[in-house]
Amino acid sequence: MSHDTIFAAAPVPPSLALPYPLILGRAGLAGFPSPAQDYEGRLLDLNEHLVKRPAATFFIKVTGDSMEGFGIHDGDLLVVDRSIEPRPGHILVAMLEGELTVKRYAIIDTHPFLCSGNPRYAPIPLVQHECQVWGVVRSVIHEYPV
């Protein structure tokens, strides 16, 4: 999976925070709350919610289908944190043999691999490739077609 664009994270001014009602729900329920239901209004700042360390965060837009099994699809926007130490199971953005890629870091039989979330792509053994980790994916922003 390669990239289209890398965007630096910049704090969003508080004036751009959007109001949202505090509504608690369960997965599987959909719809709107009763208009008569009391709720407390709050402000939601997506930058505050998604970006934990602004100085170490960047965004990258995904192209390709290699990570679909992990819920990362073509066109998704990834929030990547450079300050997180990579561990097995993390989704990484890495420079692999001169190409930017997004893969899941795994240890298989004591050897490090970068793995796709699509069975069409074989795991990549890191002992055979030059690899530089750029960061760990913290969040995925996925837009549904409307």
Regions found by a protein language model. Name each.
Residues 55-57, 87-92:
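Short, hydrophobic/aromatic-rich segments at coil-to-beta transitions
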Residues 113-119:
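Catalytic Cys-His active-site segments of thiol-dependent hydrolases/isopeptidases
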Residues 96-101, 131-132:
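Short coil-to-beta-strand transition motifs
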Residues 75-76, 90:
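Structural motif
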Residues 1-68, 99-100, 107, 111, ...:
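Short, positionally conserved secondary-structure boundary motifs
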